């Protein structure tokens, strides 16, 4: 199979210059059962570190890291990371500030190169893995309309395709508006549309909702989940918000001291019931594990730490 490595050229990264009710008794029984499973020590939902692949590449993996380390001068940010990301999966990465989450994302995006180890990406059919990235800042060009921002890098023949994607994110009626006329949540919807118009195989999300209010975040969660389920791209989300990780991911990775310290499956039905006992139990389990690392457990990322915007009063944020 033809594989591309992190040294191979990626396509342009959009955003870089740039979402039958069960009977109540059945719901309660299911929630209680799932919560009990999650609370049980040695739950099968937790993937033991020893079971993670240490060499080779599974044929269904879109991304594989084998012994990957990243150093900035004398500082080691990622240390011998072994990781496989299955094609079509939604993986959320959590951890304290500076643990290496964003560095890992930038390596996968090809914006940084590993100091050692191998990072392999595989597109469908063995070709290049078309990758797009979405940041906390929507990075829209203020002198271009919403539609023109979505069409960046595309020819005029893509107008209908861009309008269709704007319709998918609920902003078709704002196609001719300027970015300054939009709310923060609407601007992020445009950024999402700009990434999805290319129909990427891999979508990287670097804390894209961190600056939004709580209600808008929940609406964006529903939108992102719906589009992921429809298009089945591989998604890799970096977030400080453990609740967000449980809401969106089918797998949660905790980065601690430059390594994958926890690899947790999310055995919850979609769409996620945030008020369920199982959801709360899993959120609590992951949050406690994040906090157990201690405030001095991680070195700082060497890039864009000053760009982080962290809402105040989010009790489920691990910062």
Swiss-Prot record:
Gene3D superfamilies: P-loop containing nucleotide triphosphate hydrolases. It is found in: Cell inner membrane. Pfam families: ABC_tran. The keyword Mitochondrion does not apply. Residues 63-282 form the ABC transporter domain. GO terms for molecular function: ATP binding; ATP hydrolysis activity. InterPro entries: AAA+_ATPase, ABC_transporter-like_ATP-bd, ABC_transporter-like_CS, ABC_transporter_ATP-bind, P-loop_NTPase. It is an enzyme of class 7 (translocase). This is Aliphatic sulfonates import ATP-binding protein SsuB 1. It comes from Burkholderia cenocepacia (strain HI2424). The gene is ssuB1.
């Amino acid at each position: 199979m033809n594989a591309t490595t992190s040294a191979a050229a990626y396509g342009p990264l959009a955003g870089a210059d740039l979402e039958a009710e069960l009977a109540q008794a059945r719901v309660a029984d299911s929630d209680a059962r799932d919560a009990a499973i999650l609370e049980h020590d040695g739950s099968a939902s937790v993937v033991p570190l020893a079971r993670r692949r240490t060499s080779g590449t599974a044929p269904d993996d879109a991304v594989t890291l084998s012994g990957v380390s990243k150093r900035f001068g004398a500082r080691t940010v990622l240390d011998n990371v072994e990781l496989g990301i299955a094609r079509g999966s939604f993986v959320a990465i959590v951890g304290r500030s500076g643990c290496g989450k964003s560095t890992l994302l930038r390596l996968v995006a090809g914006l940084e190169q590993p100091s050692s180890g191998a990072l392999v990406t595989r597109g469908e059919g063995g070709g290049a893995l078309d990758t797009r990235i979405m940041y906390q800042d929507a990075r829209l060009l203020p002198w271009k309309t919403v539609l023109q921002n979505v069409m960046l890098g595309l020819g005029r023949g893509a107008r209908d395709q861009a309008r269709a994607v704007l319709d998918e994110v609920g902003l078709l009626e704002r196609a001719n508006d300027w970015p300054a006329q939009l709310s923060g949540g609407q601007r992020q919807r445009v950024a999402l549309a700009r990434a999805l118009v290319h129909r990427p195989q891999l979508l990287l999300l670097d804390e894209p909702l961190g600056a939004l209010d709580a209600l808008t975040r929940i609406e964006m969660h529903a939108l992102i989940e719906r589009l992921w389920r429809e298009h089945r791209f591989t998604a890799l989300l970096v977030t400080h918000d453990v609740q967000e990780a449980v809401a969106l991911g089918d797998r949660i990775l905790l980065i601690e001291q430059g390594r994958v310290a926890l690899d947790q499956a999310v055995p919850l039905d979609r769409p996620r019931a945030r008020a369920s006992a199982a959801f709360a139990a899993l959120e609590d389990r992951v949050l406690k594990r994040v906090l157990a690392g201690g405030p001095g457990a991680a070195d700082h990322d060497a890039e864009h730490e000053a760009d982080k915007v962290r809402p105040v009063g989010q009790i489920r944020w691990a910062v």
